[in-house]
Amino acid sequence: FKYAWVMDNIKDERERGITIDLAFQKFDTPKFNYTLIDAPGHRDFIKNMITGASEADCAVLVLSAKPGETDTAIAPGGQAREHAFLLKTLGVGQIIVAVNKMDDSNFSEDAYKAAVEKGKGLIKSCGYKADEVPFIPVSGWMGDNLVKKSENMAWYSGKTLLEAFDDFVAPEKPTGKPLRLPIQDVYS
């Protein structure tokens, strides 16, 4: 969880192993300055995910290489399905799909390919061009392919997650249009 703990600062998040609230972290790459918005994936906190996604120019959708988890996530009512549709609906036009938990499948290329095949069907149904979306095998637990190439996945020759961020294209800002901003709560 060391990489998740960078963003999960609330005691409940660390104890339960899930993101509850939005967390923001700034970082730079050679091409862009980023503000990472870590949004919850759990269905109980979908309002927080929508708030974060409404501010995003691009996103990382996370699927699992662990057998059965991607099937559940992309099925009707599944969280990955809901998040993918919400991202597209909220105008997030560019995504990367991180195939996580590669360590749970012993870094199996077959597990990765199975998740990619299912993931491509999902994102295509949401309106994304599946052939333009990179799928990157990662292990959040071990740190594989997040920042540096994984020695455990010699079969993968693509970019790391961090390297893939610089393939995003900066969206044109609607500076000549009326102001729009997300509102999460109203207090009286």
Report residues per predicted region.
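P-loop NTPase switch module centered on the Walker A-proximal segment
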Residues: F1-K47, A56-E69
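Conserved C-terminal guanine-recognition region of P-loop GTPase G domains, centered on the G4
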Residues: G52-A53, A59-E132
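Short, glycine/acidic-enriched loop or turn micro-motifs at the edges of active sites
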Residues: G41, D103, M142
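Amphipathic alpha-helical transducer elements in NTP-driven molecular machines
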Residues: A4, I20-D21, A39, R43-I46, ...
